[in-house]
Amino acid sequence: QINFRTMTMSTSPIIIVPARLASVRFPKKLLADAGGKPLIIRTAERIRSQAPEFDLFFAVDGVELKKVLELAGYNTVLTSPDLPSGTDRIAKANQELQKEFVINVQADEPLVTRDHILSLARAISKPRVSISTLASVFQTESDFLDPNQVKVVLDNEGNALYFSRSPIPVSRAKESKWGNEKTARGYKHMGLYAYNREFLEFFLDSKEST
């Protein structure tokens, strides 16, 4: 059990939310109304209520999001709108923040829980762990078959082996049905991550060298 209160300011995990307004599938989704407030503010409030002990930053792609968040009292780091992924945005933001451990919560994830955040914080604070993510067992066959739900195959120690939108793993046994003990139900990838600073630096360096 890790006591985050006893960790130093430099080693205690922080939360960075990568926030991109120029979404291709849903432009300005993060500013869409969610019960009277922008979606990104709902996410921010949820994170703050669930994990108030963690410093929270938003890595934004422009001044519009920056103004909305700062007006509501949240910290932001301005990053290039041309960055291709949330991990790129977090890595660039952490070049400025220089934190040892970073938890990545998606900007459109207003249902994130304290357990999610603490699980990632514990995992990334362990020795020899450079990146961690979350997965949960599928509860229904319809979700398992849904291509919009990302699946992950794990080894016996919980390490991710393979990600896919296809229903994996699948038993070859003809008599296997959903929920049958012979059928592996599969895990849903939850899209939450944690990284250490060394991994984020390596991530950026590897891109710059290609």
Across the structure, where does each feature detected by a protein language model lie?
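Hydrophobic/aromatic residues located in beta-strands of well-ordered beta-sheets
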Residues: 15, 56-58, 102, 132, ...
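Short phosphate-binding loop-to-helix
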Residues: 57, 63-122
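Conserved core of the sugar-phosphate nucleotidyltransferase
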Residues: 113-206
